[in-house]
């Protein structure tokens, strides 16, 4: 396991990491995303869902797929449609999460493939705005986010640390694995125990993080 004194930064994903997937926010985001793709391509929502599942998995984000394969050039309209004001209605502060984060004596930052306005809404609703020194969003990474190596490197460089000194926590195996491949330390949030076969260090939620770091 890890010892916190070996680390200089805790770098956290946002969605389905700082709050449980079971809250339903990701479901709402995906529905809006499918609707946007359907309107842009002029196809049914069901067809958009199928096409996203087939093609977007080859990219870091749906936005990157649309840009590369579909000639998409209006990311701001995409962000506005997928992340409207009030989207955070289903979230609420979690005292256990607050205690867990406060128990980890490391600077903390967010690395997300979403836009900053979404990230700040989520952090405010969760009561976590003052727990993070920085938010590195998709614009910070020139719309090429995780799992591109430069996304992780930029975040660590901006935080003044090396990748090897950073623990990155995410709910997506491919994003955690990409960070591990760079020599960093990675941890997967696997709330529903779906990824036992991935061979990655795992916790069910961030409330387990202090115990994970303290384990021998």
Q: Regions from the language model: what does each represent?
A:
Residues 22, 37, 55, 67, ...:
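Generic anion/oxyanion-binding catalytic loop in active/binding sites
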Residues 89, 93, 111, 144:
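Residue-level marker of regulatory loop/turn positions in helix-turn-helix DNA-binding domains and
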Residues 3-98, 117:
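N-terminal helical cap/lid subdomain that shapes the substrate entry/recognition surface
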Residues 2-8, 102, 109, 115-216:
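Asp-based, Mg2+/Mn2+-dependent phosphohydrolase catalytic module
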Residues 96-106:
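A short, Lys/Arg-enriched amphipathic alpha-helix followed by its capping loop at the start of a domain
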């Amino acid at each position: 396991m890890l010892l916190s004194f070996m680390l200089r930064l805790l770098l956290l994903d946002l969605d389905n990491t700082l709050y449980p997937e079971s809250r339903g926010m990701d479901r709402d985001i995906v529905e809006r995303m499918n609707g946007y793709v359907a309107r842009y391509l002029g196809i049914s929502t069901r067809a958009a869902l199928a096409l996203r599942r087939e093609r977007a998995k080859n990219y870091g984000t749906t936005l990157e797929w649309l840009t590369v394969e579909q000639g998409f050039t209006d990311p701001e309209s995409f962000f506005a449609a997928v992340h409207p004001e009030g989207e955070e209605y289903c979230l609420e502060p979690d005292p256990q999460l607050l205690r867990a984060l406060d128990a980890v004596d490391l600077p903390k930052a967010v690395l997300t493939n979403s836009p900053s306005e979404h990230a700040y809404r989520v952090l405010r609703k969760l009561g976590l705005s003052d727990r993070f020194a920085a938010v590195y969003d998709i614009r910070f990474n020139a719309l090429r986010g995780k799992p591109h190596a430069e996304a992780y490197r930029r975040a660590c460089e901006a935080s003044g640390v090396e990748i090897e000194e950073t623990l990155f926590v995410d709910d997506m195996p491919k994003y955690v694995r990409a960070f591990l491949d760079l020599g960093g330390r990675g941890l997967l949030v696997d709330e529903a125990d779906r990824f036992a076969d991935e061979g990655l260090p795992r916790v069910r939620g961030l409330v387990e993080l202090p115990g994970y770091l303290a384990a021998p």
